[in-house]
Amino acid sequence: MKTPTEVGQIAEDLITTYCTSAGVETPDDVRKACELLISKAARAIEKYNGHPKSVEVLSRTMSYVATNPMPAGGVQ
């Protein structure tokens, strides 16, 4: 697998393409589209790693987002 930095950039590019392809126009559209993407990703993790691991990943992600808000300008 590529480095975390490389994979992070690939994810950013894919999310941009996904949102554009989905016809996202508003911040609420971004939320809805990304929520569906998060759900699909969690199910993919569950399919190959099991339900407990999927829940663990979602919990870890929730904790990280809750304690590390984006800086002004939205660049992480």
Q: Where are the regions that the model predicts?
A:
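Solvent-exposed interaction surfaces and binding hotspots enriched for charged
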Residues: 1-76
